[in-house]
Amino acid sequence: MPKMKSVKSAVKRFKVGKNKIKRGSAFRSHILTKKPAKRMRDLRTAKYVHSTNVKAVEKMLGI
């Protein structure tokens, strides 16, 4: 049986670390002038995929 293909959009959005899956923050693409600098700084940092979504993301990535 051939290998499962990974979802290419998921491959571009998620990075797999040692034990967790990292993701970027939303709300950073446009209309940034009204958002405070503190919020923009916080949105810059990477987040981890929530435990309820890990199984679905792993399936998309073919893990």
Swiss-Prot record:
A single Gene Ontology molecular function, please? structural constituent of ribosome
The superkingdom listed in its UniProt entry is: Bacteria
Q: Which UniProt keywords apply?
A: Ribonucleoprotein, Ribosomal protein
* PROSITE patterns, A to Z: RIBOSOMAL_L35 (PS00936)
- Which GO CC terms are listed, alphabetically? cytosolic large ribosomal subunit
One Pfam family per UniProt: Ribosomal_L35p
Biological process annotations from GO: translation
The Swiss-Prot or TrEMBL record describes its family as follows: Belongs to the bacterial ribosomal protein bL35 family.
Q: What is this protein called?
A: Large ribosomal subunit protein bL35
Species, as recorded? Campylobacter jejuni subsp. jejuni serotype O:23/36 (strain 81-176)
Its gene is rpmI
